[in-house]
Amino acid sequence: MKRTKRIIDIGIIALLVVAAIGLLAFSWGGGKPNDLSIPVGSFEFTDQDGGQVGLDDLKGKVWVAHFMFTNCSTVCPTLTANMAKLQSEIKSAGLKADLVSFSVDPEKDTPEALKTYIGKFTDDLSNWHALTGYSFEDIQAFGQLSFKTAIQKDAIGDQVIHGISFYLVDASGTIVTKYDGQDPPYSQIIKHIKALSR
């Protein structure tokens, strides 16, 4: 009886030790985020330089995506400024990750308009792809299918209603987690990018 109890106690202690090690590994950035597992659908859109950027071009890279438009009078300036700060944090950490901004107002957001807009927030567009070159219906369907986010036109104005999340995508093109784009947890995002880059 005592022997059986001792074996059970040892088993419980072993499980607790394993759990503690796992928790520490994740907190140190060793754990890869996996609360989402959504494959991004295939795409090939036009970037701010007039070139084509698609899912195949991003394969093998870690990237962070969000939705925006240049005529946005509400959340987009904050989201884009926060994405620019994330770009700076990524560089400071010595990491590599691409940033992808999908326009939800492609009829107005030409490549030139996107380049001018993003240029207000950063001088470095080398790893930032601001994308357009599709119909509103296309980006609406793409957002819903690939990012599980709703995109719709404002019935009484020229604004577009869209989500405010930043999406972290791994090298295989799978969304692994998302963050509040209005108040990003920069240190956590950096840890996650580091974990995915190993």
Regions found by a protein language model. Give the residues of each.
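Thiol-/selenol-based redox modules, centered on thioredoxin-like
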Residues: 153-198
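A short beta-strand-turn-helix
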Residues: 43-62, 87
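Structural micro-motif
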Residues: 128, 140, 144-152, 160-167
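Short loop/turn microsegments at loop-to-beta-strand junctions
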Residues: 40-41, 62-63, 163-165
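Short active-site neighborhood of thiol/selenol oxidoreductases, capturing the structured segment around
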Residues: 55-77, 83
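Structural microenvironment flanking redox-active thiols in thiol-disulfide oxidoreductases
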Residues: 80-142
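N-terminal targeting signals for export/organelle localization
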Residues: 1-46, 196-198
